[in-house]
């Protein structure tokens, strides 16, 4: 039986909270899933359905209850690659020939290192290399390379998968942005581990035009930038516009949204 370890970011650190199991995987059935919280974790946080739990539907408990409906745990759809990110991973892992259920398992195991939110699959974390920890890119790299940035980053030795945690049809990247005082310019980097609370570099979700990236697609993305500012002026609670930016690349614009799920102390 295949199993994956689930982690949660709680009070400033990643901790193991449970095991996702595939009880029928020996029969090549990856659609049936179960979640069992770790015993010590369940003892400390029993019955909590807040950020300690994987979802409201699965509060922390000692035993898994499928409510008489065995199958796919819906919260997994929220953390595994989807949309443009899924297409990248399916191609990158060369799993086009697998069934969608088998693809889901492989994507959970290898591509769920940095989803939006406070959950991740521990098995997805790449081996740590010094070159990847000290690899920086320019803003021009991100805004001009657009969809090719991941391949470019991978070729240079970065753990590019750490930038793929956002779902949706529009291509998106999860990046960090800081300032290099030596060169006097901004530095962009990929943070697949998200484990250094002393680093205050900004967290961004960088969004590119969806579809065929036509003039209309590009203008829709540009309009989104201004809509956020108008909503903020009207007093509507939305993504913070502090640090939000609209960058014009050689071919397409990119919208840099501050991460709403990350708080830097």
What name fits each language-model region?
Residues 1-265:
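Phosphate/dinucleotide-binding and metal-coordinating scaffold of catalytic cores
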């Amino acid at each position: 039986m295949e199993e994956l370890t689930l982690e949660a970011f709680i009070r400033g650190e990643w901790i193991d909270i449970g095991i996702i199991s595939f009880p029928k995987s020996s029969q090549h059935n990856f659609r049936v899933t179960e979640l069992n919280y770790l015993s010590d974790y369940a003892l400390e946080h029993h019955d909590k359905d807040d950020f300690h739990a994987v979802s409201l539907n699965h509060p922390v408990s000692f035993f898994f209850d499928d409510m008489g409906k065995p199958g796919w745990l819906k919260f997994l759809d929220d953390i595994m690659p989807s949309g443009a990110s899924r297409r990248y991973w399916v191609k990158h892992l060369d799993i086009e020939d697998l069934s969608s259920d088998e693809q889901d398992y492989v994507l959970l195991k290898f591509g769920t290192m940095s989803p939006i939110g406070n959950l991740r699959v521990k098995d997805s974390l790449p081996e740590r290399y010094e070159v990847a920890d000290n690899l920086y890119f320019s803003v021009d790299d991100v805004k001009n390379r657009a969809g090719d940035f991941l391949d470019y980053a991978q070729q240079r030795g970065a753990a590019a998968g750490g930038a793929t945690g956002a779902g949706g049809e529009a291509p998106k990247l999860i990046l960090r942005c800081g300032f290099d005082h030596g060169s006097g310019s901004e530095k962009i980097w990929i943070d697949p581990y998200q484990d250094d609370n002393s680093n205050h570099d900004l967290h961004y979700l960088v969004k590119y035009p969806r579809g065929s990236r036509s003039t209309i697609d590009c203008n829709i993305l540009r309009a989104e930038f201004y809509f956020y500012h108008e909503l903020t002026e009207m007093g509507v609670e939305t993504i913070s516009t502090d640090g939000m930016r609209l960058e014009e690349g050689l071919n397409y614009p990119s919208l840099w949204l501050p991460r709403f799920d990350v708080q830097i102390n």
